């Protein structure tokens, strides 16, 4: 069986050159990118990674990839990350893995952003996948009520154990469901006006190259 995630994840490593500062995303596809980069580092490649989550940091450290914090780099040459959905306007939803805030901060500091996906992630309109919003625990119910007044349904993210999911930053995540985000700019503005929302999973002006793996194993490169 063809592993589309592995194919896409490893393909993106072709953009990595010696001496680069590389943003390391979070998720099941970029997992394979990091595994491949670990091999390349062990074979002599010199890079510095900037991890977008504790999970990614642990994986990179186990593979021997040198890391620095975002505070300790002036800029990032390339960030490779996954996405939950991408539309035809290069707008995306990210944050299914809970790392949206750090992912967006790292993406903002990057000269180039590459997203690695399997073909089902390419959609006409955003919204089949829930839109995560990271909120501070204090008063999160007020945020939920504010959105309810706008007829926006949210679900508080929980772990499989039933406990509330807590991000690496100590926050909660509300997932917006049953919405289509055709006017993503409007949604971005709306969410930015609600106190207590730390960040949202709309990534509207970030990605430069999409590495998309097809079911037959072929790779499609989609560039802005």
UniProtKB/Swiss-Prot annotation:
Subunit details: Homodimer.
Keyword Isomerase among record annotations: yes
Descriptive protein name: Ribose-5-phosphate isomerase A
Domain of life: Bacteria
Broadest EC class assigned to this enzyme: isomerase
Phylogenetic placement of the source organism: Bacteria, Bacillati, Bacillota, Bacilli, Bacillales
Catalysed reactions, as listed in the record: aldehydo-D-ribose 5-phosphate = D-ribulose 5-phosphate
Keyword Nuclease included in the entry's annotation: no
Active-site residues, Swiss-Prot/TrEMBL: 103 (proton acceptor)
A UniProt-annotated Pfam family: Rib_5-P_isom_A
UniProt record similarity statement: Belongs to the ribose 5-phosphate isomerase family.
UniProt-listed Enzyme Commission number(s): 5.3.1.6
InterPro entries named in the record: NagB/RpiA_transferase-like, Ribose-5P_isomerase, Ribose5P_isomerase_typA_subgr, Ribose5P_isomerase_type_A
GO BP term, example: pentose-phosphate shunt, non-oxidative branch
Pathway it works in: Carbohydrate degradation; pentose phosphate pathway; D-ribose 5-phosphate from D-ribulose 5-phosphate (non-oxidative stage): step 1/1
UniProt-annotated binding residues for substrate: 26-29, 81-84, 94-97, 121
Function: Catalyzes the reversible conversion of ribose-5-phosphate to ribulose 5-phosphate.
MF term (GO), any: ribose-5-phosphate isomerase activity
Native species: Listeria monocytogenes serotype 4b (strain F2365)
Keyword tags: Isomerase
């Amino acid at each position: 069986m063809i592993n589309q995630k592995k194919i896409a994840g490893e393909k993106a490593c072709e953009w990595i050159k010696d001496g680069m500062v590389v943003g390391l995303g979070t998720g099941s596809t970029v997992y394979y990118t990091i595994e491949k980069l670990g091999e390349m580092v062990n074979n002599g490649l010199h890079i510095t990674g900037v991890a977008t989550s504790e999970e990614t940091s642990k994986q990179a450290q186990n593979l021997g990839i040198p890391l620095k914090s975002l505070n300790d780099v002036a800029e990032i040459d390339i960030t490779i990350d996954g996405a939950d959905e991408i539309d035809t306007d290069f707008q995306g939803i990210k944050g299914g893995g809970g790392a949206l805030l750090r992912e967006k901060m790292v993406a903002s500091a990057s000269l180039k952003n590459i997203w690695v996906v399997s073909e089902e992630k390419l959609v006409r309109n955003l919204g089949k996948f829930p839109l995560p919003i990271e909120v501070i625990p204090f008063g999160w119910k007020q945020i939920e009520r504010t959105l309810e007044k706008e007829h926006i349904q949210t679900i508080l993210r929980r772990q499989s154990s039933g406990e509330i999911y807590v991000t690496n930053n100590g926050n909660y995540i509300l997932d917006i469901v049953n919405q289509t985000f055709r006017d993503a700019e409007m949604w971005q503005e709306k969410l930015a006006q609600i106190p207590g929302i730390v960040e949202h999973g709309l990534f509207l002006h970030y990605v430069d190259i999409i590495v998309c793996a097809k079911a037959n194993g072929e790779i499609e490169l989609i560039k802005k």
